Curated annotation (Swiss-Prot):
Residues 11-21, 46-57, 151-180 have a biased composition (Polar residues). It holds the Pfam family QWRF. Residues 98-110, 129-143, 271-285, 302-332 have a biased composition (Low complexity). PANTHER family: AUGMIN FAMILY MEMBER, QWRF MOTIF-CONTAINING PROTEIN 4. InterPro entries: QWRF (IPR007573). This is QWRF motif-containing protein 4. Residues 1-227, 271-369, 588-609 are annotated as: Disordered.
Length: 609
């Protein structure tokens, strides 16, 4: 009953996992590369349920990345399980040294160099480094092509399970009646690396260094006939026993070898590079930036020479590590084994198999030990860790967006400051221009006012010049007018003030009338006589005015004569001097003539005083 219930529960889990995962393409093209002699097993397998196991399960907790732990021990039977090759058979080879012992004895750095990642790899849900999101300084990790396992014996690109896997299949068939241990969580196997079967995918790196995640090689179990279960231990044994050069020396590297990989340290940024020694690796190396403080928690990534994983089982780490998961030139990739795109976090969550059962085509039987028992709590913890990783990734994205927002704010503030300064300069320039224009307007206004005043003055002067003749005539008319007014005033005074009007005087009106009339007659007679004399006086006045003009002309002529007399005196003196000079010249000529006429008797010359 228990076996039947286990089968039913396992069938439900397989159906739920197959429904949850992405649909695969048919595996028909891979049939031509495999040998048909190997009989196919049924697609359903008896896999013990991890939830209904009567044995007490032990919760597997993720080890701390700081505390170094040894790999869990496993039974030697797990190292006999190897993939069976479709073309050739290999003899069952047992490792001379248990893999778990090798992992314990080897240094952490040598294990990392030989396997490409630590023995305990992160679960896909926790592969994403949580501390990388908060570090501004990143580390460039070019993945080396040295770590790619070489296949020199054949160019076939099919999966070749080893004979140890056949032996393991026979052993599993003989022991199918007994109840199997609760299988461990499925994880991405390490390609050709020493991995203990007891190591779960949820475990973290043992030391503080980074690790490399190698995608699984035998994800597509449909390409292998007769065996649908794979073990990680037998692949590790097979990779250890490969007769390739420089393979055994990888496991003997000390921890000092990795110090040569850290080449430059500049401002908190490390660049770790590995030398490429594979002669048939032609794919380009990809860079992975990570923080030095988050090396213990760095999510692994696959080497360029490793095989690609299936889309439903690939471990997606980040968009930057997708380039490092290329294909080896010597190992082609079938259309059904192509590399799926990387960069969607939903694929990371969907690739983790938490508490959803195990597909029959993906089951890997591990060693039957008590250390492989897992519980539901570990799956819940994995889910929580995956959510935490996504939350921290969202926080990292938010911080990046906030940094970009801060940069744009700074750029906008700087642009606003520049525009504000430019506006101030423009305003100041406009104010200066306005002030200069206002000054020019004031100057033009004052000049216009002055010009208007000058025009008014010129007009006033022209009017006054026209009135000057009338004003000059007015002076003469005013003088005559004043004289006539003075005569009229004298007559009125003589007629009024000389009469005895005060002291009670009395006069006879008849006699007064007669006296007044007689006085008037006398005055009229006097006026007629004065009028006759007045004409004579006017003539005399005219003669006197002519005489004044003549006298003035005479005075002018007298002044002129005086000047002429003064000049005549000077001219007279000059005339006398000239005459004297002429006389002297004449005398000199005469003496010279006399000397020429009588040369024997020279005459003495006497100078005139």
């Amino acid at each position: 009953m228990q076996v039947g219930s286990k089968k039913a529960s396992m069938g439900k889990q397989q159906q739920s996992v197959s429904d949850a995962t992405s649909p695969r393409p048919p595996l028909a093209p891979s049939e031509k590369n495999n040998v048909g002699s190997v009989t196919r097993r049924a697609r359903t397998m008896e896999v013990s349920s991890r939830y209904r196991s009567p044995t007490p399960t032990k919760t597997r907790r993720c080890p701390s990345p700081i505390v170094t732990r040894t790999a869990p021990s496993s039974s030697p039977e797990s190292f006999l399980k190897r993939a069976v090759s479709a073309e050739r058979n290999r003899g069952p080879s047992t490792p001379t040294t248990p893999v778990s012992d090798v992992l314990v004895d080897l240094p952490v750095s040598s294990r990392r160099l030989s396997t490409g990642r630590l023995p305990e790899s992160l679960w896909p849900s926790t592969m994403r480094s949580l501390s990388v999101s908060f570090q501004s300084d990143s580390v460039s990790v070019p993945v080396s092509k040295k770590e790619k396992p070489l296949v020199t014996s054949s160019t076939d690109r099919t999966l070749r399970p080893s004979s140890s896997n056949i032996a393991h299949k026979q052993q599993s068939e003989t022991t199918s009646v007994t109840r199997k241990q609760t299988p461990e969580r499925k994880r991405s196997p390490l390609k050709g690396k020493n991995v203990s079967p007891g190591q779960s995918e949820n475990s973290k790196p043992m030391d503080g260094s980074h690790s490399m995640l190698i995608p699984p090689q035998h994800r597509w179990s449909g390409r292998i006939r007769g065996n649908r279960s794979f073990d990680l231990g037998d692949k590790a044994v097979r990779r250890v026993s490969l007769p390739l050069s420089n393979k055994s020396s990888r496991h003997k590297k000390s921890s000092s070898d990795i110090t040569r990989l850290f080449s430059c340290y500049d401002n908190g940024r490390l660049e770790v590079s590995s030398s490429t020694t594979s002669e048939d690796s032609s794919s380009t190396e990809s860079l992975k930036h990570f923080s030095t403080s988050s090396l213990p928690r760095l999510h692994p990534m696959s080497a360029p020479g490793s095989r690609t994983a299936s889309p439903s089982r690939s471990s997606f780490s980040s968009s930057s590590s997708s380039n490092s998961r290329g294909m080896s030139p010597s190992r082609g990739v079938s259309p059904m084994r192509g590399l799926s795109p990387v960069g969607n976090r939903s694929l990371v969550r969907s690739s983790t198999p938490p508490s959803r059962g195990v597909s029959p085509s993906r089951i890997r039987q591990t060693a039957q030990s008590s250390s492989t028992n897992t519980s539901v709590l570990s799956f819940i913890a994995d889910v929580k860790k995956g959510k935490k990783a996504t939350y921290i990734e969202d926080v990292h994205q938010l911080r990046l967006l906030y940094n970009r927002y801060s940069q744009w704010r700074f750029a906008n503030a700087r642009a606003e400051g520049v525009s504000y300064v430019q506006s101030l300069i423009a305003k100041e320039t406009l104010y200066n221009v306005w002030h200069a224009i206002s000054d020019l307007r004031d100057l033009v206004t004052t000049q216009r006012i002055c010009l208007q005043q000058l025009k008014l003055e010129i007009k006033l002067r022209s009017i006054l010049n026209d009135q000057m003749v009338c004003l000059e005539d007015w002076a003469m008319v005013e003088r005559e007018h004043i004289s006539s007014l003075a005569g009229a005033i004298g007559d009125l005074e003589a007629n009024t003030l000389r009469l005895p009007l005060a002291g009670g005087t009395k006069a006879d009106l008849g006699s007064l009338k007669l006296a007044m009339s007689s006085a008037l007659d006398v005055m009229q007679s006097m006026g007629s006589s004065i009028w006759s004399l007045h004409s004579q006086m006017e003539e005399m006045n005219k003669l006197v005015s002519d005489l004044a003009v003549i006298a003035k002309t005479e005075n002018f002529l007298l002044d002129k004569c005086e000047n002429l007399l003064a000049s005549t005196a000077v001219m007279e003196i000059e005339e006398r001097s000239l005459k004297t000079h002429l006389i002297q010249k004449k005398q000199e000529e005469e003496v010279r003539d006399d000397a020429e006429s009588s040369p024997l008797l020279p005459l003495s010359k006497f100078q005139w005083p």
